[in-house]
Amino acid sequence: MGEDSNMKMTGIVNYEVEDVFNHFIKNAKKDFSDFNEDNPVGCKIEKDITTGGAKPIRCTVEITDYEKNGKYEITTSNEYSKCVSTYTFVGQKDGTTKLTISEKQTTQKFVQLTTLYIQRFFARRAFKRSFKNIIEVLNNELRVHFENVERSKKKRA
């Protein structure tokens, strides 16, 4: 019997959608040696993820959906569960980007109900922290990038 857990958050990054998406993908593709910008769907890696337990859990991380300047989706799976993380990017009229991150986790093997609720509680807290961090990092890194571009233009002038 499987159990589902869904989480979703939306925030604003203060830059154009193309800039936000390109910067996000530049960081995301570092994990995938076979990343193909034209069609990265199907790229996958094996990765050990630490969860606080005695030993790390071996997972497969695969890019399962991709639309340039619109969507990036990865599926992380192991023998116990599967988590689909979807990042959607929507350009706004004011030149900012609305970034929505949603996660759907399915536990494939029976897990004691109390354990499941505790895991979900901590997962939601971690998800919120991670989301705020992603928005903050994107805003800060893009700000620094564009400040450096401006400085470089002034030096040439």
Where are the regions a protein language model picked out?
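Glycine-rich portal/gate segments that line the openings of hydrophobic small-molecule binding cavities
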Residues: 25, 30-84, 133-157
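A short, structured loop/turn motif at beta-sheet edges
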Residues: 14-18, 64-69, 88-100
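Short amphipathic alpha-helical segments
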Residues: 16, 20, 123-126, 130, ...
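Beta-strand/loop substructures that line and gate deep hydrophobic ligand-binding cavities in soluble
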Residues: 79-129, 149-151
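Residue-level preference for beta-strand/loop junctions
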Residues: 3-5, 55, 81, 95
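Hydrophobic ligand-binding cavity/cleft-lining segments
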Residues: 1-41
